[in-house]
Regions:
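Non-catalytic connector elements of ABC transporters
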Residues: 171, 181-287
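ABC transporter nucleotide-binding domain
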Residues: 151-179, 183
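A structure-centric signal for secondary-structure junctions around beta-strands
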Residues: 8, 92, 118, 170, ...
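Glycine-centered flexibility sites
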Residues: 12, 33, 59, 70-71, ...
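Short, flexible helix/strand-to-coil boundary loops that buttress conserved ligand/catalytic motifs
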Residues: 5, 159, 167-168, 222, ...
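ABC ATPase nucleotide-binding domains
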Residues: 6-12, 16, 20-163
Length: 287
């Protein structure tokens, strides 16, 4: 690919703002690139029909972009690229202008198309849910550098550093000092007290570090592991989740309860115990 001039690289591009010709119908927009390539009329018609089937827009051939919803316009932009049979597909935040429900629907369609067609796809997004749900591998970048390239599950559960842990999902961060290793746990002194974290061999005693604990990995009550007591500062009902902000020894800790139908929403000021296992606390060197 590096040895080819840009106009000879068979790359398809889908833009954030759709980039449709407003004076052209769906048919005109989708076949624009095919006509530039001077394909035979029969081939153009066949590719148009196949492309519209792939994006569920059969019957919309004679409509103009202004007569389509945002989701339908983005499907037209996808079809325009797919009819060119690209070797690589580039998508630059293609769903950012869509409403939440439509975004989820089109996201699922893009994933289905990518799997069905087997096209190598580079998808740029700031939406973490999009990145995790669409990708086979996710690259987290900062200032032009890739900090971690990994499958979504690995990226979420085993981030390479604090930046990745903070960028992907929600985390509680606790600053502390390593005190050494005990069994399978790394012992860290934090403002909450002593916390046992997932074991790391490269953090020596006395090393400043940061612990990351995801809200969904913290449970109500007392159990073996790390248990602390605090007071509810804010309680939020989010439908399938109860989100608590808890003051623990002057540190605000976020806690998610995933089965709210089994729990009453505790009011601000209520004392509560919270616990998490050592495996839920990831340690990183202080940056």
């Amino acid at each position: 690919m590096d040895g080819l001039p840009p106009w000879e690289r068979n790359i398809g591009m889908v833009f954030q703002n759709y980039a449709l010709w407003p004076h052209m119908t769906v048919r005109g927009n989708v076949t624009y690139g095919l006509r530039l390539r001077k394909l035979a009329r029969r081939e153009i018609v066949a590719r148009l029909e196949a492309g519209l089937r792939k994006v569920n827009l059969v019957g919309f051939e004679d409509r103009y972009p202004g007569q389509l919803s945002g989701g339908q316009q983005q499907r037209v932009a996808l079809a325009r690229v797919l009819v060119l049979n690209p070797d690589i597909l580039l998508l630059d935040e293609p769903l950012s202008n869509l409403d939440a429900k439509v975004r989820v629907q089109v996201r699922a369609e893009i994933r289905r198309l990518q799997k069905d067609l087997g096209i190598t796809t580079v998808y740029v997004t700031h939406d973490q849910e999009e990145a995790l749900s669409l990708s086979d591998r996710v690259a987290v970048m900062r200032e032009g550098r890739i900090l971690q390239l990994a499958p979504p599950k690995e990226l979420y559960e085993r981030p390479a550093n604090r930046f990745v842990a903070d960028f992907v999902g929600t985390n509680n961060f606790l600053t502390g000092v390593c005190r050494g290793v005990e069994g399978d746990a790394l012992v860290v002194e934090t403002p909450l007290g002593v916390v046992r974290a997932r074991r790391r061999e490269d953090l020596a005693a006395g090393t400043p570090c940061v612990l990351a604990v995801r809200p969904e990995n913290i449970a109500l009550g007392r159990a073996d592991g790390n248990t602390f007591t605090g007071r509810v500062v804010l309680a939020s009902y989010l439908g399938n989740t109860l989100r608590y902000d808890v003051d623990v020894a002057g540190t605000l800790v976020k806690l998610d309860v995933r089965d709210p139908w089994h729990h009453e929403l505790l009011p601000p000021g209520q004392e509560m115990a919270l616990t998490f296992p050592p495996s839920a606390a990831l340690a990183f060197p202080e940056e």
